[in-house]
C-alpha cells in the first residue's frame, strides 16, 4: 500500500493525455531533466532521502533507481566506464534538483486514493515539488491512521476521521441493557450470548425473563415444563424380615396404582417408584390423586430409617462398652507401672541416702585426722623451740660472764642485767604458750568423754552417729539436708568456748585411740620447767 509521497512521481505530473501510465514518452519536459537510461524524470521519488539526481565524477547523471540497478550488475559508470565502488562515491546534482522542483508542476500526493486506483475524493491542488512540505501539513485529504485504538489498522483521510470514529469496530460503547463497556464489533455477540440483563422469551410458557433469571425460572417455576414426580427417587422393597434391598426394576408398575393398608401385612410387597411425568401446574393434582400410594412409600422409608437408626445405636453402645473396657485396662496398667516406678525410686533413694551417710562420715573422719595432725605438728614445733631457747640462754650467759670479768665491773653488771631481762621475757612467752596448750588439751579430753557417752547412747538406740551428735529420723530420710547442716559452721556451747588456741576457731575433734599418743599429752616436755 503506497500513500502520499510513496506514489511514483510520474503519476503526479500534469499532462494533457491522461494515458500517461501506458506511454511515459508523452510526458513533455526538458531533456536536461530526463534520465538517459529510463527516459524518465531524474527525480524518481518524492521521499526526502530518495529525491536525488546522482552523477559520477565525470558528470554523467542518472536517476536513483537506474543507478541502483546498474551497480548491482557492474561497478562502473555506463557512459565513461569509471569504477564506482558504492553509492556513497556518487554526488548529488543540486542544480538539477532545484530546477526540477521549481519548474515541474504536479498534483498533490493525496490526489489519488490509497490504492492508486482513482482520484475519488482526492485533493485537487496543483503545486510544484518544492511546495509539497507546506501543502501536505495543511491538506485536508492527507492519510492518517485511526487514533481510537491501537488495534485498529485502518487508514483514513483526515477529513473523514469523524465519520470513522463513530463507526470504528474498536470503539468502546456501553451495553444498553447492562451498562457494561464492550467494543463495537463485539456488541452483537454480547447481546445474543453474554448479557445477563437482556430479556429472553421462555420457550415453554412464552414469558420474558432476563438471562440471569431464566434458568431459575425453567428449573423451579415454569408451569408448562414437564417434571418428574418427587417420589421417583424412592426405590424400596419392604418385607416382614426387615431386609433392606434395592429395587432395580423401577419401571415394573405404573405410579397410579394405590396400595391399601391391608397389603402391607403381606409377606413381600414390591413398591415401584412413581414414574409419572406431568406439568408443574398439574403437580398438586397428581399429589391429591396418588396421596395414599405416596404415604405408603413414605411410611416404608421411615420404618427403614428407624431400623437403621436402631442398628447404629446398638453399634454405638457396643463401641462405648468396648471403649470403657479398654480405658479400664489402660488405667490398671498405668497404676501397675506407676507403683513399680515408685518402688524402684524408693530403693534408689534409700541407696542414695546410705551412700550420703557413708560419705559424710568419711569426710568428717578425714577432717578430724587432718586437724589432729596439724595440732601435733604445732606442739612438736613449740616443744623443740622451747628446748632450744633454754640451752642457748645458759651457754650465752656463761660466755658473757667470762668476757665481762676481763672488762670493767660496771659494764659487766649492766650487760648481765639486760640479758637477764631478755631471758625472763622469753621464758614468760614460752610459759604462756604452754598454758594455752594445756587448756586446749583439757577441752579436747572433756569433749572426748562427751563423745564416748554419745556413742554409747547411739548404740543403744541403734541410730547413726557422728561427732556432732546422733542423727534424727528426718535427717536420715533427707541426706541432702543432713549434708547441708554438717557443712555449715556449728555454734559451739559455752562449755567449749575455751577451745580456741593459736590456730583460730576450730570444731571439736576426737583423738584416734589407735594412734600411739602418750597418756599425758605434756610428757614430751619432761625435763623442762613449765
Curated annotation (Swiss-Prot):
Residues 242-267, 391-432, 483-530 are annotated as: Disordered. It is found in: Cytoplasm. Keywords: Coiled coil, Cytoplasm, Metal-binding, Repeat, Zinc, Zinc-finger. Its main location: cytoplasm. A zinc finger (RING-type) spans 35-81. A zinc finger (TRAF-type) spans 134-188, 189-246. One of its GO terms (cellular component) is cytoplasm. Belongs to the TNF receptor-associated factor family. This is TNF receptor-associated factor family protein DDB_G0272829. It comes from Dictyostelium discoideum.
Amino acid at each position: 500500500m503506497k500513500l502520499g509521497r510513496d506514489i511514483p512521481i510520474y503519476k503526479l505530473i500534469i499532462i494533457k493525455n491522461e494515458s500517461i501510465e501506458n506511454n511515459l514518452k508523452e510526458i513533455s519536459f526538458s531533456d536536461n531533466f530526463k534520465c538517459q537510461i529510463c527516459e524518465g524524470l531524474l527525480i524518481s521519488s518524492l521521499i526526502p532521502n530518495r529525491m536525488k539526481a546522482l552523477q559520477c565524477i565525470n558528470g554523467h547523471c542518472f536517476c536513483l533507481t537506474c543507478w541502483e540497478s546498474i551497480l548491482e550488475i557492474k561497478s562502473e559508470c555506463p557512459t565513461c566506464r569509471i569504477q564506482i565502488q558504492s553509492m556513497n562515491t556518487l554526488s548529488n546534482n543540486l542544480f538539477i534538483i532545484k530546477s526540477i522542483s521549481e519548474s515541474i508542476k504536479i498534483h498533490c500526493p493525496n490526489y489519488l486514493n490509497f490504492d492508486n486506483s482513482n482520484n475519488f475524493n482526492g485533493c485537487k491542488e496543483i503545486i510544484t515539488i518544492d511546495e509539497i512540505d507546506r501543502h501536505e501539513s495543511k491538506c485536508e485529504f492527507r492519510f492518517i491512521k485511526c487514533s481510537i485504538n491501537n488495534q485498529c489498522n485502518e487508514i483514513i483521510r483526515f477529513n473523514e476521521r469523524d465519520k470513522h470514529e463513530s463507526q470504528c469496530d474498536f470503539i468502546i460503547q456501553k451495553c444498553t441493557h447492562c451498562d457494561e463497556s464492550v467494543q463495537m464489533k463485539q456488541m452483537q455477540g454480547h447481546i445474543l450470548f453474554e448479557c445477563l440483563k437482556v430479556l429472553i422469551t421462555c420457550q415453554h410458557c412464552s414469558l420474558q425473563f432476563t438471562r440471569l433469571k431464566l434458568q431459575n425460572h425453567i428449573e423451579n417455576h415454569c408451569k408448562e415444563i414437564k417434571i418428574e414426580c418427587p417420589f421417583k427417587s424412592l426405590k424400596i422393597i419392604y418385607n416382614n424380615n426387615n431386609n433392606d434391598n434395592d429395587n432395580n426394576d423401577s419401571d415394573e408398575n405404573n405410579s397410579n396404582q394405590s396400595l391399601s393398608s391391608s397389603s402391607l401385612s403381606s409377606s413381600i410387597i414390591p413398591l415401584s417408584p412413581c414414574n409419572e411425568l406431568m406439568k408443574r401446574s398439574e403437580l398438586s393434582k397428581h399429589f391429591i390423586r396418588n396421596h395414599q400410594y405416596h404415604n405408603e412409600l413414605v411410611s416404608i422409608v421411615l420404618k427403614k430409617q428407624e431400623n437403621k437408626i436402631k442398628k447404629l445405636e446398638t453399634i454405638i453402645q457396643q463401641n462405648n462398652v468396648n471403649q470403657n473396657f479398654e480405658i479400664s485396662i489402660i488405667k490398671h496398667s498405668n497404676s501397675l507401672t506407676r507403683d513399680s516406678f515408685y518402688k524402684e525410686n524408693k530403693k534408689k533413694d534409700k541407696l542414695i541416702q546410705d551412700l550420703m551417710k557413708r560419705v559424710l562420715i568419711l569426710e568428717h573422719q578425714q577432717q578430724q585426722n587432718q586437724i589432729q595432725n596439724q595440732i601435733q605438728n604445732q606442739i612438736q614445733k613449740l616443744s623443740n623451740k622451747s628446748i632450744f631457747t633454754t640451752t642457748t640462754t645458759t651457754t650465752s650467759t656463761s660466755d658473757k660472764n667470762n668476757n665481762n670479768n676481763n672488762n670493767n665491773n660496771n659494764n659487766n653488771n649492766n650487760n648481765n642485767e639486760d640479758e637477764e631481762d631478755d631471758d625472763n621475757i622469753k621464758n614468760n612467752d614460752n610459759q604462756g604458750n604452754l598454758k594455752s596448750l594445756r587448756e586446749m588439751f583439757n577441752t579436747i579430753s572433756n569433749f572426748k568423754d562427751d563423745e564416748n557417752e554419745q556413742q554409747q547412747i547411739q548404740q543403744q538406740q541403734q541410730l547413726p552417729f557422728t561427732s556432732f551428735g546422733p542423727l534424727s529420723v528426718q535427717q536420715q530420710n533427707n541426706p541432702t539436708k543432713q549434708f547441708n547442716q554438717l557443712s555449715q559452721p556449728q555454734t559451739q556451747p559455752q562449755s567449749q568456748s575455751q577451745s580456741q588456741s593459736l590456730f583460730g576457731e576450730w570444731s571439736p575433734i576426737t583423738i584416734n585411740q589407735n594412734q600411739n599418743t602418750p597418756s599425758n599429752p605434756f610428757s614430751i616436755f619432761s625435763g623442762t620447767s613449765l
